[in-house]
């Protein structure tokens, strides 16, 4: 298996999407609830904008009854938000567990069809990692991925539409920063993905080494090879530590980049928004709304960034799962093959030869014999 060169994200997602098929209704309802959780955040800036502008322009119109009604409206939105968030937290995770279970079942069934040559060339520890721990992260990935990106896109579009209605120039100025942020973050994201791939591969190597040592524990002790095994494990363990340090270096750079853009966007809102307000292009309440929408956007981007590690873990798990599923069995039924019936029990070898893959010579060479039903035949090697 080639784990050095990663698969393209588009190919991985294409192979993963069919697993949502059985849970399509659950996913749609989950995304609907995700949309409901954005209501409070998107409406609050408009409420504060209205109260601020009314207070500065016509304070008498801002009655106690009006403020209470606005407060009750926002309270209802928060209740809806809480109920929707509960559904997402429970049902979304359960859907993820179902998908993880389906993938593990498919991987196990596929492994049963693979020939001995696959198992001869692949460490059992690597296989175990691929069908167990590698798929754990798929549970989180499978529901958080559509939720987080759907929420981010929805908030971005709605915020842009609302702010464009207030002042298009200032809105375009602020939103021009987002593509630059995305390009910068994507580069670091790819580096993090490559590092996670190395981590998973090294974990598989460690699992394989632990399994070999424990299964052959009696032999190790018989030859007093404990120091050798400890040194081998220590070397692999230290290599894993180096890979993790490398990963966290990229993750730290990733987070610092986003924090820098956070500061730049706030500076832009303060300076540009202040100048627009001085020139009478926006009201004080509008500046409050701009600041809050920018905060909402940055909070959403931070959530995507925090999810980035989980996203890369999930993608790496899917990639390693797909590497198993892409292995073609050496022995397959011909097209239109029929089940064997009316078996009489007679076995006949007609000039049969056999060699293990990559072996230099045949272990069975041009054998011809016939074993009748009930007869016992032994093939004894000649030395």
Language model segments and positions:
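Transmembrane helix-loop-helix hairpins at lipid-water interfaces of multipass membrane proteins
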Residues: 27-87, 164-169, 280-284
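Transmembrane alpha-helix boundary and packing residues in multipass membrane permease domains
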Residues: 46, 50, 54, 90, ...
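Alpha-helical transmembrane segments of multi-pass membrane proteins
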Residues: 32-33, 77-96, 147-154, 175-199, ...
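ABC-type nucleotide-binding domain
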Residues: 333-334, 340-383
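An intracellular "coupling" helix at the cytosolic face of ABC transporter transmembrane type-1 domains
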Residues: 24-25, 113-117, 133-142, 146, ...
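Extended non-transmembrane interhelical loops and adjacent amphipathic helices
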Residues: 1-21, 50, 90-136, 205-211, ...
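Helix-loop-helix
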Residues: 57-59, 63, 69-72, 162-176, ...
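Hydrophobic alpha-helical transmembrane segments of ABC transporter permease domains
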Residues: 32, 36, 40, 44, ...
């Amino acid at each position: 298996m080639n784990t050095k060169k990663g698969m393209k994200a588009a190919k991985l997602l294409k192979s993963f999407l069919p697993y949502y098929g059985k849970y399509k209704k659950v996913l749609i309802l989950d995304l609907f609830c995700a949309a409901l959780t954005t209501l409070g955040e998107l409406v609050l800036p408009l409420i504060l904008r209205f109260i601020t502008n009314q207070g500065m322009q016509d304070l008498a119109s801002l009655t106690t009854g009006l403020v209470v009604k606005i407060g009750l409206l926002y309270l209802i939105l928060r209740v809806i938000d809480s109920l929707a968030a509960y559904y997402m937290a429970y049902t979304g995770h359960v859907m993820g567990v179902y998908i993880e279970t389906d993938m593990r079942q498919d991987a196990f069934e596929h492994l049963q069809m693979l020939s001995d040559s696959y198992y001869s060339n692949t460490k059992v520890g690597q296989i175990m990692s691929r069908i167990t721990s590698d798929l754990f992260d798929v549970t989180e990935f499978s529901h958080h991925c559509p939720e987080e990106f759907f929420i981010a896109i929805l908030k971005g579009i709605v915020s842009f539409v609302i702010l464009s209605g207030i002042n298009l120039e200032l809105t375009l100025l602020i939103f021009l920063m987002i593509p630059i942020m995305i390009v910068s973050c994507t580069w670091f994201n790819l580096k993090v993905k490559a590092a996670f791939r190395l981590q998973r591969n090294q974990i598989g190597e460690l699992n394989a080494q632990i399994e070999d040592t424990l299964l052959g524990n009696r032999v190790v002790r018989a030859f007093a090879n404990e120091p050798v095994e400890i040194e081998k494990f220590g070397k692999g363990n230290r290599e894993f530590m180096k890979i993790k340090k490398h990963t966290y270096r990229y993750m730290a750079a990733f987070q610092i980049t986003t924090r820098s853009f956070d500061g730049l966007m706030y500076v832009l809102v303060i300076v540009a928004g202040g100048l627009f307000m001085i020139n009478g292009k926006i009201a004080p309440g509008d500046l409050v709304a701009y600041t809050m929408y920018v905060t909402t956007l940055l909070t959403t981007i931070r959530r995507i960034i925090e999810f980035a590690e989980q996203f890369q873990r999930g993608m790496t798990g899917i990639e390693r799962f797909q590497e198993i599923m892409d292995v073609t069995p050496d022995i397959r039924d011909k097209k239109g093959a029929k089940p064997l019936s009316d078996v009489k029990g007679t076995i006949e070898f007609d000039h049969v030869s056999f060699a293990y893959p990559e072996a230099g010579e045949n272990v069975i060479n041009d054998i011809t014999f016939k074993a009748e039903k009930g007869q016992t035949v032994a093939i004894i090697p000649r030395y």
